[in-house]
Regions:
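Cleavable N-terminal export/targeting peptides
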Residues: 1-23, 165
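Short loop/turn motifs that connect adjacent beta-strands in outer-membrane beta-barrel proteins
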Residues: 19-23, 50-51, 94-102, 115, ...
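Residue-level signature of outer-membrane beta-barrel architecture
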Residues: 46, 90-94, 127-129, 145-147, ...
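Outer-membrane beta-barrel "beta-signal"
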Residues: 86, 152-165
Length: 165
């Protein structure tokens, strides 16, 4: 009996139990950004220690404008303001709750807007709720400052899912 207790105690002390560390997720987010912009993001997230994470993202969006001919949003000009970009985000955990966390996210992005290339810096907040299956619901407040073209600032809300693999 003493040997069994010693083995169990050694196992508990000798092994580390870190909840949520080194998890990997496929992420999908979609939402609206200011100034009349639709946005969709795909990504790969790798969790680090203490609730922090790194995410590699690919993003596509469209900034629509009114048609000068018909005076409203028409299908002929709706898809003219598209953009795409990709980036690397570091997500610092600000607060961990029982089944959720709040993170500060920031990092560089590179892409193109209607054929012109740009460099961007993204920052914002991310709230994640973890379901019992391991799937996460995320609510993201995004701020993006773009350089080298006219669409210089985007901010808004995105909602999405993170699926573990």
């Amino acid at each position: 009996m003493k040997k069994l207790l010693f083995v169990m105690l050694s196992f508990l002390v000798g092994t580390g139990a870190m909840a949520g560390e080194k998890d990997e997720y496929f992420t999908f987010n979609a939402g609206f950004l200011f100034n009349s912009t639709l946005n969709a993001t795909l990504g790969y997230e790798h969790e680090l220690t203490y609730g922090n994470a790194v995410e590699l993202t690919a993003e596509i969006g469209n900034q629509w404008q009114c048609d000068p001919v018909c005076g409203k949003i028409c299908k002929d000009v709706f898809w003219k303001g598209y953009y795409w970009d990709g980036g690397l985000l570091y997500k610092h955990c600000l607060k961990k709750f029982k089944n959720s966390n709040l993170r500060l996210r920031f990092g560089p992005e590179f892409g193109a807007y209607t054929g012109r290339y740009f460099f961007a810096v993204e920052g914002g907040l991310e709230y994640n709720y973890v379901f019992p299956s391991g799937v996460q619901f995320s609510l993201i407040q995004k701020n993006q400052v773009n350089f080298l073209h006219g669409d210089s600032f985007r901010n808004g809300l995105l909602i999405g899912l993170k699926i573990p693999f």
